[in-house]
Design a protein with these regions (language model features):
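Receiver (REC) domain active-site loop signature in two-component systems and cognate sites
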Residues: 55
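C-terminal output helix
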Residues: 106-115
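Helix N-cap/capping motif at the beta->alpha junctions
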Residues: 30-39, 60
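Short amphipathic alpha-helix used as the core "switch/output" element in two-component signaling
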Residues: 39, 61-74
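Two-component/phosphorelay signaling modules centered on CheY-like receiver
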Residues: 10-29
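Active-site beta3 strand of CheY-like receiver
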Residues: 44-50
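Alpha4 helix (beta4-alpha4-beta5 surface) of REC/receiver domains from two-component response regulators
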Residues: 17, 62, 85-100
């Protein structure tokens, strides 16, 4: 499985990558902002996107909307990561087509459960 991790903080990308490796995923790419993520998604084949909500210029919700509006990417599993579990944000993400939502900080076990839930539903 090829996973794209999108976060503007290198330390957070490193943490998520480390957690993914703990639960058995090795094929992980990174993007440091929403624009880079969209470029990588257009040229690459990914099985899952794990994307931070709060990023400058192109926030995670805009990445999600762009993915859902792209005929080639519209069914790509998408896990939104955020530091805040505001109900309005969760509802906006659900409306935009997010598969799962995870609040920082989280453990490898929580991440594993969210990923399993995405693929069990698919």
């Amino acid at each position: 499985m090829r996973i794209l991790v999108v976060d503007d903080f290198a330390s957070m990308r490193k943490i998520i990558k480390g957690l993914l490796k703990q639960i058995g995923f090795q094929n992980i790419e990174e993007a440091d902002d929403g624009s880079t993520a969209l470029e990588k998604l257009k040229i690459g084949e990914f099985d899952l996107v794990i994307c931070d909500w709060n990023m400058p210029e192109v926030p995670g919700i805009e990445v999600l909307k762009a993915v859902r509006n792209d005929p080639r990417l519209k069914d790509l599993p998408f896990l939104m990561v955020t530091a805040e579990a505001k109900k309005d944000n969760v509802m906006e993400a659900v409306k935009a087509g997010v598969n799962q939502y995870i609040v920082k900080p989280f453990t490898a076990e929580t991440l594993k459960k969210k990923i399993e839930k995405i693929f069990d539903e698919g």
